């Protein structure tokens, strides 16, 4: 087997000029000449604003196509420019890999009221309050997309944690209460901070069947729409590993075993 070389084709402090996809398309042949076999691209989804690197993901179905969060383009450009960059990479024999952020959602459209307990940030298994109601940013309506591609709306019960109580204007880590709610099982996420299911924003609850169904639907749509040939999975130490194994298995069964998947797992060990 010929040695392969993957390149991370972005860094945190790129200019927010919307030209990154165009630059990548123009650079494709040069990368191939250098011997690059795989290119890891930054998150292509609509995030909190046009300057967001992409990890504050808002709408997985908006690749820089709809006027949402004050912008049509993402930090990197428009949907058609993203698709063109992918096609240019494939034409010169480079495998394009998408950065996929499935741990959380940010910048919800509406507040909702629901019950939580506050937990210790240093040990998320330790509750430090009795149950109480907060107003949290958990209702995602995606009005700018107007139900194109997918009509799912996210509500508080699709998440298991959030980090801000608008009612009291107070940040914290709030474990959402309700039937079958709670962090992922301790043996299915990293044990840093007791249970590291929660990282930031509104944390997806992979015990909820509607969440799983929507993410599977998104993956089918995304690969068909873009033609990417691999995923870099963000923040896998924070995501239920039972879901993640099944998700990767499903993608490979549909796209072929050569579909390249790797994950980010930061650990001090």
Question: What spans do the regions from the language model cover?
Answer:
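Short, mixed-charge, low-aromatic patches
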Residues: 33-43, 168-178, 197-207
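Core domains of carbohydrate- and sulfate-ester-processing enzymes
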Residues: 118-195
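Active-site-proximal loop/turn and secondary-structure-junction residues that shape catalytic pockets
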Residues: 45, 102-106, 175, 182-190, ...
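N-terminal structural segment of carbohydrate-active enzymes
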Residues: 1-95, 110-113, 204
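Generic structural motif
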Residues: 12-15, 209, 268
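Active-site-adjacent "subsite" loops/lids of carbohydrate-active enzymes
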Residues: 125, 154, 177-220, 225, ...
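Active-site-proximal helices and loops of the catalytic beta/alpha 8
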Residues: 2-4, 23-30, 50-56, 61, ...
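Residue-level detector of flexible, active-site-proximal loop/helix-junction positions
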Residues: 67, 163, 268
């Amino acid at each position: 087997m010929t040695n392969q070389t993957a390149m991370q084709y972005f860094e945190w402090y790129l200019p927010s000029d919307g030209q990154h996809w165009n630059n990548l398309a123009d650079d494709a042949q040069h990368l191939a000449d250098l011997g690059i076999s795989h290119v890891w691209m930054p998150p292509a989804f609509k995030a909190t604003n046009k300057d967001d690197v992409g990890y504050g993901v808002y709408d997985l179905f908006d690749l820089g196509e709809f006027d949402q969060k004050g912008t049509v383009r993402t930090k990197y450009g428009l949907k058609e420019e993203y698709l063109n960059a992918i096609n240019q990479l494939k034409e010169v024999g480079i495998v394009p890999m998408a950065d996929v952020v499935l741990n959380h959602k940010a910048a919800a459209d509406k507040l909702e009221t629901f019950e939580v307990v506050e937990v210790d940030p240093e040990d998320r298994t330790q509750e430090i309050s009795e149950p109480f109601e907060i107003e949290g940013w958990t209702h995602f309506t995606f009005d700018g997309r107007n139900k194109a591609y997918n009509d799912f709306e996210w509500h508080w019960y699709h998440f298991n944690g959030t980090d801000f109580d608008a009612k009291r204007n107070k940040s914290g880590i709030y474990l959402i209460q309700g039937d079958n709610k709670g962090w992922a099982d301790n043996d299915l996420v990293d044990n840093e901070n007791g249970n590291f299911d929660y990282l930031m924003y509104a944390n997806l609850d992979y015990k909820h069947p509607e969440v799983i169904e929507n993410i599977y639907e998104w993956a089918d749509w995304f690969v068909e729409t873009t033609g990417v040939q691999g995923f870099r999975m963000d923040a896998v130490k924070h995501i239920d590993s039972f879901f993640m194994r099944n998700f990767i298995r499903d993608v490979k069964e549909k796209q072929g075993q050569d579909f390249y998947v790797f994950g980010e797992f930061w650990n001090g060990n």
